[in-house]
Amino acid sequence: AIYNDYGGLGFKDESIKMANALGNKQHMILANHGIITTGETVAEGFNSLYYFEKAAETYITALSTNKELNIVSHEIAEKTSEEAANYPVDTAKQFLSEIRCILDKEEPDYVN
């Protein structure tokens, strides 16, 4: 979802408008602000944000080549999204666990 109707801090009225705009989607880009990601768990939310950022980074890098992009069809994108959502292993939980292990070793102050 894309949210262009920023009306101030996300207190009651604004948060209701934002929630309605998000609907059942996992991501919402807030115009001139940033992104909101959701998930049923913290791991899913983190995973969603991480891969959204990676996709955006890859897209910007591809654009910087000034070459024609070979973008997959909407059907293939939907199929891939469904396959990832139905993957039999909880990769989001595993990924967050591994990130925390790295942080525990390299940046232990993150817990404070």
Where are each of the predicted segments found?
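Class I SAM-dependent methyltransferase SAM-binding "motif I" and its flanking Rossmann-like core
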Residues: 1-9, 14
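Hydrophobic N-terminal alpha-helices or hydrophobic patches in metabolic proteins across all domains
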Residues: 4-7, 24, 43
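A general structural signal for well-ordered alpha-helical packing
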Residues: 15, 19, 46-49
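Crotonase-fold acyl-CoA enzyme core
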Residues: 16-30
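A conserved C-terminal secondary-structure "cap"
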Residues: 26, 34-112
